[in-house]
Amino acid sequence: MEKRKAEIEKIILDFLREHGEHHFTCALATCWENQPRNTPVDARNDGLTMYFVADPGGKLENIRRNPNVCLAVFIPVGKGYMKNARGLQMWGRAQIITMEEDPEEFEKGFRTIRLDEISMVSYNRPFPEAVKPKISMVKIIPHRISYFHSTGEKPVTYVWE
């Protein structure tokens, strides 16, 4: 029996909740002038929307030129290879967010990523306010997500659109 969009969304959100307690290490694919680029990023989600902090460089330049991206979130499978592989691919449009251009969305991303919490754990102090204006965040709004789960028997793939 085929699953409805709401059921697939719940499966995806459960996967993200289960494996994203702290953050997700993801692979972000961007492209410009037929030159693909894949960059590891640490992201967090608000529903199906993903946020991450982005250092200046190739990924931001590619997003400025072509906001169509693909983000892969996966769980390393270890020695069992495909016996318990789980992950998803998310196709969507990326937006670069700065405090200066969109303070409300920036603060939402800041809270979603939990930069204060990360700063307390890493440096034993809150995130410095003076640094906020220097940060760029990326927000990805998906239009398609493919979730894959293999238990070693019959793999399943669910597509959310």
Predicted features, each with a name:
Residues V53-G57, C70-V77, R114-F127:
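Short acidic (Asp/Glu) patches
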Residues H23-P56, L71-I75, Q89:
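Short beta-strand segments
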Residues E33, G58, G78, P142-S146:
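Short acidic/polar capping segments at secondary-structure boundaries
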Residues M1-T25:
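Extreme N-terminal tail/first-helix region
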Residues E21-A27, I118-S122:
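Short Pro/Gly-enriched beta-strand edge/turn motifs at strand-loop
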Residues E2-K3, K83-E161:
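Charged, gly/pro-rich active-site loop segments
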Residues E61-I97:
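Helix-adjacent hinge/juxtasegments
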Residues G58-E61, E153-P155:
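Short, surface-exposed beta-strand-loop junctions and turns on beta-sheet-rich folds
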